[in-house]
Amino acid sequence: MVKLADPATKFTKDSLVSETSPLKESWVPLVSDDERQSYASVLPFDTHKASWTTYTQLDGWFDALHPSQFEKSTHSTVDKTAWTPASYRGQPLWRQTAWVTLDPNCECDYGYSDTWQKRATCPTFRRIVQDITEYVQDATGPTFNACNLNYYPTGAGIGWHADDETLWDPFHRPVTIVSLSLCRGPDDGLLAGARRFMIRCQEYHPGDHPYDVVLKHGDLMTMEGFFQKHYLHSVWPGDGMSPDPLNDPFVSGERINLTWRTIVRHLDGSPASRGQVCPLSKLQTDESQTKTTEKPTDPVDNGDEDKR
């Protein structure tokens, strides 16, 4: 028997992005788990060309966000703090990560697994993310106040994890996460830089099966409801490097992934907040403060797999 959230936190399927966005006819359902109230859908860009942006603009976003654009400047007054190397349990990973809060009053850093991701402060980087956010919000419907970014070089992916941090209170309320894939490969083929996105249940129940979808340049994807509570996701080949990156079509290029979320529980000075206090935490209601229990600090042990 799957334990669901309190009835007060239930929501209806007609509130899903795939049902409410201006492009709802083009969304392809991937996970539709009514028992767990967990849903995921994909909006393939190649089936709705120029509907919400263009390939030229997608290419421009990839170039503008690429880590090579934010290497340390020779001018000490130029702030290029954007991407940071990813690590797990003291071991370096292939990915680079970035974290942007979209509300100018929000000072929340992003803590997950054993990582504490500082906010990107580079004005140029933040402006680019904000510009992309406006396009994605127009295409999908929801309004977001934070964006997490991952850069995957050739051969790299990310291990099994759930985006289940306290910032969005995913154990007590439905959460909507929208992601955009920006890809670049050694050629201009359809799979250039594409990645396999894999999904599995956190706890197996009869009838469960894994999901696998190829995310290409410009594809949008949603994870909604209590997806982060009940499901894990990863990007092939996990946290290790592909043994044959040049001949594996799903890791032969680079990928930048942006995932938008909504912070509902800002850092409040608690141990889980590492003592940090966001000014917006003062606006949180007493009910939300007492309702959420602290997550364990130790990550789920998935072998050498990383969180995020």
Regions found by a protein language model. Give the residues of each.
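Non-heme Fe(II) oxygenase metal-center motifs and adjacent flexible, charged/small-residue loops
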Residues: 1-308
